[in-house]
Regions:
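Acidic Gly/Asp/Thr-rich repetitive segments characteristic of extracellular carbohydrate-active
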Residues: 33-58
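Short, T/G/N/S-enriched strand-turn elements that build extracellular solenoid repeat scaffolds
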Residues: 42-48, 63-72, 78, 89, ...
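Sec-dependent signal peptide recognition
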Residues: 16-24
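Extracellular beta-strand/beta-solenoid scaffold signature
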Residues: 42-43, 65, 91-101, 117-124, ...
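Parallel beta-helix/beta-solenoid
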Residues: 50, 72-74, 83, 104-105, ...
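Long, ordered, amphipathic alpha-helical scaffolds
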Residues: 259-263, 294-397
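Right-handed parallel beta-helix/beta-spiral solenoid domain characteristic of secreted/periplasmic
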Residues: 35-40, 72-119, 142
């Protein structure tokens, strides 16, 4: 028997479907306009902000189509409702590369928000004196892929940089990257599923401490590279960090310098001067707990006449090392080196030095000094002589350098 409360007519059901579809289309259109409105409002606030202003972003997930920018401002705070509450998604980005770009500023604070899935870098700041990232998450939400943006947090050519209580996930170069900058603090932050978790490059005066770098290709990198505006970095301290299980396959695009970092890397110092690595726990990084290498290991040509390609005054002390008895990676160029030249098998040393030295430097002082590193095995791999005289004698590099000055 037909239900008197239910209209089964052939006309009514199609009409219901029509109105339902119309409702959905209207809702979607309204949502799209709302997202466009929030993009316009945020960008307008960034443009119109007076020096000293705070720009508050509401809670919610907002899908933005183009980059946001702030320039030529002083004493500005950009504040979300919380890293898990204010989410700016650039998944369908059609204009620009960065999520947020800040240039030519002074005393800028970015805090309590998340930026996701940008075409390029999540947040880039350039020529800013006094930049603070606090409780910020930057991430690519899909599987790690070389099409992900290069950098999560990316201050470059900045001074007085503070990165604290931040999280970086999925960068195809470095999750937290500080380049060509001066006076830097990176602390209480987390980086995982990046090629490099944290990278300090061509920068002067950096403290990297109380961070957790795990499940990256390489945990913490301290690099000096040629052909950059700021030629020589140094005075970098890496301490009180947990650097563990950085065995993630390298997914950097070919040609990037970090594409050469082997999976299973805890810390790498490349051609940098005055680096102190101490009081860290460097655990289960299968290829190299800590590596100290010259730029010659990259086999890239050096065209910059002012570039110094050797590491020097590298102090590694009072760290705790531990690793499982597993082979190093056999992938990539470095993997081939492990397999056919070094042949460590499962007994991979925790600390590896390429052994390439500047013949013009004073012979009396080793460029690296190791002391009081618990459970640490060492190898000088004699890379400059085609690995002919690999030595695991740690006594030749057991020495002490003066502590670097605190900031």
């Amino acid at each position: 028997m037909p239900n008197p409360n239910h209209d089964d007519s052939p006309i009514q059901n199609p009409m219901n479907r029509f109105f339902n579809l119309l409702f959905l289309l209207t809702t979607a259109t309204t949502t799209a306009f709302a997202q466009a409105d929030i993009q316009k409002k945020i960008q307008t606030d960034l443009i119109m902000a007076d020096d000293g202003a705070t720009i508050d972003l509401p809670a919610g997930t907002f899908v933005l189509a183009s980059s946001l920018s702030l320039q030529d401002k002083k004493n500005i705070t950009i504040r979300g409702a919380g890293a898990d509450k204010t989410v700016l998604s650039f998944k369908n980005q059609s204009e620009g590369a960065e999520g947020l770009r800040v240039t030519n500023g002074q005393n800028i604070v970015i805090e309590n928000l998340t930026i996701q899935d940008t075409k390029g870098d999540c947040i880039k700041t350039m020529n800013v004196n006094g930049i603070t990232f606090r409780n910020v998450k930057v991430e690519w939400t899909g599987k790690p892929n070389q099409t992900n943006g290069s950098y999560g947090l990316y201050p470059v050519q900045c001074q007085n940089v503070t990165i604290e209580s931040c999280t970086a996930v999925g960068a195809s170069d470095a999750g937290i990257y500080v380049g060509q900058s001066k006076q830097i603090v990176v602390r209480n932050s987390v980086a995982y599923h990046n090629v490099a978790g944290i990278e300090i490059e061509n920068s002067i005066g950096a403290d990297v401490y109380d961070n957790h770098a795990y499940e990256n290709t390489g945990g913490i990198l301290v690099f000096d590279l040629p052909d950059l505006v700021q030629k020589k970095g140094g005075n970098v301290r890496v301490y009180n960090n947990l650097i563990e299980n950085n065995n993630f396959d390298n997914f950097a695009p070919k040609g990037n310098i970090v594409a050469q970092v082997p999976a299973g890397t805890g810390v790498v110092v490349l051609a940098t001067n005055q680096v102190e690595i101490f009081s860290n726990r460097i655990i289960n990084n299968k290829s190299q707990g800590t590596a100290i290498i010259s730029y010659f290991m990259t086999e890239e040509p050096i065209k910059d006449s002012l570039y110094y390609p050797y590491p020097s005054q590298i102090s590694i002390h009072d760290n705790i090392y531990s690793r499982q008895l597993v082979p190093a990676t056999y992938k990539g160029r470095m993997g081939m080196m492990y397999r056919f030249k070094l042949r460590f098998g499962k007994n991979v040393p925790d600390i590896i030095w390429d052994g390439i030295v500047d013949e013009k430097a004073p012979a009396a002082q080793s460029p690296i000094c190791l002391k009081n590193n618990k459970n640490a095995q060492f190898a000088n791999i004699d890379a400059g002589n085609n690995f002919k005289a690999i030595s695991r004698d740690i006594s030749k590099v057991t020495c002490e350098l003066p502590p670097l000055a605190t900031k």
